[in-house]
Amino acid sequence: MTATEGIRPDVARTVRYPVYERFYTWQGEGVHLGAAAYFIRLYGCPQACPWCDSAGTWHHDSRPEGVTLMTAGALAAVVAQDSPDGAFVVITGGEPILFDLAPLVDALHALGRRVHIETSGIAELRGAIDWVTLSPKPFGTWPTPEVVARADEVKIIVHDVADLQAGLDTLEGLRPDAVIWLHPEWSKARERDMAVLNAITDAVKTNPRLRAGYQMHKLYRADELDAHSDKRLIPLGGNTDLGY
């Protein structure tokens, strides 16, 4: 099938998404850890996480000079060109559900690709997305009940011990089969902050539904191997000098 088969041609050609970066790598966290994946990172996010590792998608001191606008059809075409059949697609950000993803999801499905999303869940989730990874930001806008109910897995970023319970508090209505990951924020993992690491260990031992997680792609620096990735431009874990 072609990249635009299955969706209206006018939609495939006219809806445009602000693409910060796109690259082929593997999923570095969660249930699909280690699996080949093509990432589409969209520009724009209102959450302003203080430890953001993709601050180029929103922070005024790190955003690019220009952002490429691409149609659903054009994005599907580069996915088909730059990754083999069988690799799923991850739409991330920034905050991707600020945009109507239905045309893009349809175009990717027309290629036979499964579509995953990584989101903080603050808006309506549009499109027949196959896998929803929810990463709530309790200090910002909480996820909507509708997105919580659709989540297949949850990733709570633990920058300090209080973040752990605060993240869990946002999950009322979560499906019983949804997986809940506790990830140390990257600087805490890198510096072996034992208060954070031990809090995650204690939480998992207390509640077997929880799982301890890690961002393995950062150890491998796998994203940087694709020429289209901008990871080399933004320090891993953000830039504390700029306040993120």
Language model features with spans:
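Conserved Radical SAM active-site core
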Residues: 3-6, 12-13, 17-24, 36, ...
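Short, solvent-exposed beta-strand edge segments and adjacent coil->beta transition regions
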Residues: 35-37, 151
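A short beta-strand-turn-helix
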Residues: 28-30
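Conserved AdoMet/S-adenosylmethionine-binding subsite of the radical SAM
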Residues: 85-86, 97-244
